[in-house]
Every structure is written in C-alpha cells, then in structure tokens.
C-alpha cells in the first residue's frame, strides 16, 4: 500500500522495551504511549518524585471540563532517553476516590499515611511517555486526539461496511 508510519500513539499494552529502543529522544519518528503500571516501568516512582507538586497551580490546566495536573520529566527508560509526562485527572481522581471510600472506609482507615496520599490520586493518575518535547497540556491533547480519530474510523467502517485496515489491499483502497 505504500503507507509509512512516522508517528505512533499507543495505549499501555503496546509500550515495550523494544518500542522505546526504536522511538526515543533523538529518533526521527515520534511516539506517545501510555506507560504501563507494571514491573520495569517507573510508574509509581514518578508519583513519589512529583507528589508534592500535585495541586500546585503552576502545573494545573483544563481539558474538556476536567482539571489536570501535568508535569514533564526527562528520564531514562530501558537505558534510552525519553520524556515522562506525569498526569492526574483531578476530576476522575476525586470522584473515584470518593466511591472507593464509601465502599472501603475500614480498609482505608488501616492504610499508612503515605498510602492514603496515593489513594487520593490513584484513580486519576497516569503517565505518558514520548520523544516529543512539548507542554504537558499539548501532549495530552495529542494523545486524546487518537480517540477522536478512532471514532471517525469506527463510524466510517460501520457506515461503509469496510474491512479492518489490516485487511485492506491496493484494490480496496
């Protein structure tokens, strides 16, 4: 088909050591990916590094009626330089934390103070990794733009009764 990919926007399940090796600061093609919350990734370590900044006005912005905390940090991931954009969707964090407290009040009371702090942001906390040097607000907008594109393709696919992109040939294009 002659399609060349020069930019990727991916969910956490697709971010891997191999991908970071191919797309890091200094590489030509760009990537935005959601960092998985699993072993080998500094997901929670980044929270501990920025936790005292969460709630500070300097790092706050609004996107689609949600208040966000966002900060960019240059890190090494799998020995490659990359930007980690650390976010808290404060609306989701507060709403889901409140729901958690209603259902788990006794469990919460038993937690250590530092763990209680984590639970106040846990349900809105996420990290994006990218080789793009921009503001946290702009990168988040680019990341969520992916969902808008997915909706367009899904709607067009259903409306036109198209095959998935992976099954397209020169003649179907």
Where are these regions (language model features)?
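Anion-binding and metal-coordination hotspots
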Residues: 1-173
């Amino acid at each position: 088909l002659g399609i060349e990919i020069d930019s990727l926007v991916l969910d956490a399940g697709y971010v891997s050591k191999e991908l970071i090796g191919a797309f890091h600061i200094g590489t030509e093609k760009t990537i935005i990916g959601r960092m998985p919350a699993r072993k080998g990734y500094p997901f929670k370590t980044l929270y501990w590094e920025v936790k005292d900044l969460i709630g500070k006005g300097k790092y706050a912005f609004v996107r689609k009626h949600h208040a966000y905390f966002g900060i960019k940090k240059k890190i090494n991931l799998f020995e490659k330089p990359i930007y980690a954009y650390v976010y808290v969707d404060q609306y989701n964090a507060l709403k889901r934390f409140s729901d958690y407290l209603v259902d788990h009040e006794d469990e919460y009371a038993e937690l250590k103070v530092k763990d209680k702090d984590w639970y106040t942001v846990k349900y809105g906390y996420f990290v994006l990794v990218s080789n793009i040097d921009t503001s946290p607000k702009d990168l988040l907008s680019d990341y969520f733009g992916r969902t808008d594109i997915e909706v367009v393709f899904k709607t067009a696919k259903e409306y036109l009764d198209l095959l998935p992109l992976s099954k397209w040939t020169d003649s179907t294009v």
